[in-house]
């Protein structure tokens, strides 16, 4: 049995409530895993745990020391990478997410770094 991968990839998220809410919403949308940069807030922060409403116990997660390399590895495995970006031409609802996908979300104040956002196949708003 082959499982479709729908990954959420977070870069330097700082607010515990935001991480928890993103994880909870992601689970509702069908993500199969969460990848976070090492400088993302601790997923075991009590505010994160509370705001996930249990999603933290159901969605596999991974912290990486090198998020850029991790994204390159995903792309090498045929995973299509989308980035939430203000310069995106299409609304996220207009894209086709069939097949293995990863969705990049950046820091609350600064968004994605330029280098990571340029690694995406598609920018969406």
Q: What is each residue range found by the language model?
A:
Residues 1-125:
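Post-transcriptional modification and biogenesis factors for structured RNAs
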């Amino acid at each position: 049995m082959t499982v479709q991968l729908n990954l959420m990839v977070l870069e330097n998220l700082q607010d515990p409530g935001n991480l928890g809410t993103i994880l909870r919403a992601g689970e509702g949308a069908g993500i199969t895993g969460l990848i976070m940069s090492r400088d993302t807030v601790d997923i075991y922060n009590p505010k994160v745990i509370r705001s996930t409403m249990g999603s933290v116990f159901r969605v596999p997660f991974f912290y990486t020391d090198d998020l850029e390399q991790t994204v390159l590895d995903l792309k090498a495995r045929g995973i299509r990478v989308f980035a939430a970006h203000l310069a995106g031409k299409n609304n996220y609802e207009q894209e086709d997410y069939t097949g293995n996908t990863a969705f990049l979300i950046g820091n609350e104040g600064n968004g994605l770094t330029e280098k990571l956002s340029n690694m995406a196949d598609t920018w969406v708003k």
